[in-house]
Structures are given as C-alpha cells and as structure tokens.
Amino acid sequence: MATSWASVFLLIIAYVGGTVFYREQQTWFEGVFLSSMCPVNVSAGTFYGIMFDAGSTGTRIHVYTFVQRTSGQLPFLEGEIFDSVKPGLSAFVDQPKQGAETVQELLEVAKDSIPRSHWKRTPVVLKATAGLRLLPEQKAQTLLLEVEEIFKNSPFLVPDDSVSIMDGSYEGILAWVTVNFLTGQLHGRGQETVGTLDLGGASTQITFLPQLEKTLEQTPKGYLASFEMFNSTFKLYTHSYLGFGLKAARLATLGALEAEGTDGHTFRSACLPRWLEAEWIFGGVKYQYGGNQEGEMGFEPCYAEVRRVVQGKLHQPEEIRGSSFYAFSYYYDRAAETHLIDYEKGGVLKVEDFERKAREVCDNLESFSSGSPFLCMDLSYITALLKDGFGFEDGTLLQLTKKVNNIETGWALGATFHLLQSLGITS
C-alpha cells in the first residue's frame, strides 16, 4: 500500500442520530485532475477502477482510467468508458441467475477496455440503488449473491463487500461530490458549489450546500451530512426519496401502488391517450394500463393526478428557490426526448420550461402516435416534483447534463474514488 494514499479521501460514514458524517484528513481531489490533454502510456503509471451502478431501470458499468505521472504524487483522472444493459437487476427478482448474466455481459466491456496485465489489480464493485431497495430483502440478497459469484469467477480484484445495496443519502452525496469535482468547484477555496438533482426510476435525490443558517436550523433530522474537504468542513443538505423516482411515480399516479393485485385490472389515467390499452413491466411485475375512455384527458386533470403524488410529502427548503442546480438522469432524458435540450450537449432550462412542454404534449394526446405513451405523465410529474414537491420557482435555472468533461455525472466516480483509496491502490 502506497503511503501517499494513507491520508487521502478517507471516507468514514457514521450514523449518529440519523446524520451521515464524512471525515477525511486530506482529500484525493486535491491532486486528481482531468488530464485529457496528456497521452496515456499504459505501461507507465496507469491503473483502473470498475464501478457497476445497478439501478431500477438498467445496469451500468463505468470503467475509469487513472494515470500516476510522477511517483509519490496523486493520480490524474484520464477518462471513462461507459456501457449499460436493460432491464435492471430488479426485473430478474425470480430469475437471479439470468440477472447476474447481464452483469457478466458488461464485464466483457471491462476486459476489452483494460490491459490483461492490469486485471488482477483492478477492483470491481457493484452498488445497487432504489430498484433493489424496493424488493423483499431475501430476494434482493439472492440476486446480489449471484452477481458476487460472477465477480469471484472474473479475473479482476474482488474486495470485501464488493456487491451491496447503497444507502440513498450516500448516493446523493457522492453525486454532489462528482459534479462539483468535475465542474471545478472543489479544486480551490472560495468557489460556489452547485446543487444536484438526480431522478432515477425508483427514487430521487436532492443535495446542496446550504448558505443560510436558517436552512440548517429548519432542516429535518437526518437531512444533513457533514464532512471535511480541503481543510474545510461542509455540511450538505441531502435526502433520497424512495418511491418518488419517475417510474415508481407512474405506479403511484395510476393508483397501482395501493392496489391489492394487478391481475385482470387496468389502471387508467388522464395523462394517457384515451384510446390507449397497453401493458408495462416494472420491477418484474406486469401492469395493464390505459387512458380514461369516458373521463377527462389533458394537462390540467393529469397535473392534478401527479400533484397528489408529491404534494405535502417532500421537504421544501426555502433556500433552493433561487439556487442553481445540476439535474441529470430522467430530468435529462425527458428534456432531450422533447427537444428542450440537445441530446449530446445538454443545456440550461427554467423549471417552467418543463411545464410548458408538459402542456404541449398533454393537450395533444389525441394526436399521439409515437414515442413513450407516458411522456405526458412523465413531464407533468417532473414539473410537479420540482414545483410542488421541492418548491422550486418557475424561473429557477437547471443545468441539464449527462457528462462533464466527457465523464458521466452521477455517484459512480465519487464511489470509485472511495473504493481505490480504501484499497490503497495506485500504480
């Protein structure tokens, strides 16, 4: 174990009264920079990390390349290779071996990306998020054990606890660290950080650095996480709302969450085309759904349905109303699909832009002919989540991004930092 790692990014999590505390002596971020301008010599100081993100709608692999250009100094983040498969592991709740095979498929990407000489010292880890949190514990563990066997039979380094379900708050914190690191907000003192909004299939996270003492005083217990970085202490507001992801919200809007069973029942909504009769599988369960054949249809009745899902159920910190946030995952996907932003480059939107597009789509459901039949519902839910859930103002600016400096946003990079440090891995 290289001694230069003994004091870098020591990430210690302790639950005290529901609060997550992070402690470090000297952060690894002080010496990690994107070095895309520097060519990589694989034989001289290059090493790798493999992080699997097992989400509710798909499983994603991130293969990170790091370069140690000078012995004894901290490494550079050279780049990332990303791939994914659908559906997510939770869809294989009753076929765990088949679920593990999807991970095996993605492991081939890592083999193709990493030189054989580096396999044995490259760690591989899978962290599952809300999709597996929603499953019965025994079934979730059975899935994870099958994945662990895949890892053990691979040529890569398999650390203890290589396969686990990640706490939602941890997910939000690591995403905030990743985005603020990639945007350069954590490289020096006195710079303003940005908040992060992550919308997955089963859960959603909000994380930001409060600037007002009032926010700290009024925040509910368990929503604050303290940690040290750059010899400064940060106290983040962070919370993960399980069941408020985009696809879980569809079930709530349809009334499927309260239903005793799904067989023979068609769930209907004003957010869907009147003529629609279809089926949808989520979390391994098949749902029949359709439009209101006789009832209302369009934005106003749809918005009333989705507002009931979030209203009064999320904490609304006043401070965020005028703050800037980075938003990704389904925020990005739905904005790109409806041409609110460029699919490759992303863009900046106001919260009200989601509502404008929702009205446009929902009030033209009769002419709907292609794309997702849930588009009206999804856009309306995103609008309600931002406005009625979190309490953002119409004019709040959101930076929608999938990548920063060609690196995927989300929690995976932050988690890989922690993984490599905890194992003491350098070149």
Curated annotation (Swiss-Prot):
> Which residues pair up as cystines?
271-302, 362-376
Q: How does it get modified after it is made?
A: N-glycosylated; high-mannose type.
Q: According to its UniProt record, which residues of this chain constitute the active site?
A: 171
Give the main EC class.
Answer: hydrolase
Pathway terms, separated by semicolons = Protein modification; protein glycosylation
Cited PROSITE patterns: GDA1_CD39_NTPASE
GO MF, one example? ADP phosphatase activity
Q: Can you supply a Gene Ontology BP term from the record?
A: protein N-linked glycosylation
Enzyme Commission code: 3.6.1.6
Q: What is its main location?
A: endoplasmic reticulum
The cofactor required is: Ca(2+); Mg(2+)
Q: Which GO terms describe its cellular component?
A: endoplasmic reticulum; endoplasmic reticulum lumen; extracellular region; extracellular space
Origin: domain of life: Eukaryota
What's the subunit arrangement here? Monomer; active form. Homodimer; disulfide-linked. Homodimers are enzymatically inactive.
What role is this protein assigned?
Hydrolyzes nucleoside diphosphates with a preference for GDP, IDP and UDP compared to ADP and CDP. In the lumen of the endoplasmic reticulum, hydrolyzes UDP that acts as an end-product feedback inhibitor of the UDP-Glc:glycoprotein glucosyltransferases. UMP can be transported back by an UDP-sugar antiporter to the cytosol where it is consumed to regenerate UDP-glucose. Therefore, it positively regulates protein reglucosylation by clearing UDP from the ER lumen and by promoting the regeneration of UDP-glucose.
State the family named in the UniProt similarity comment for this chain: Belongs to the GDA1/CD39 NTPase family.
- This protein's name: Ectonucleoside triphosphate diphosphohydrolase 5
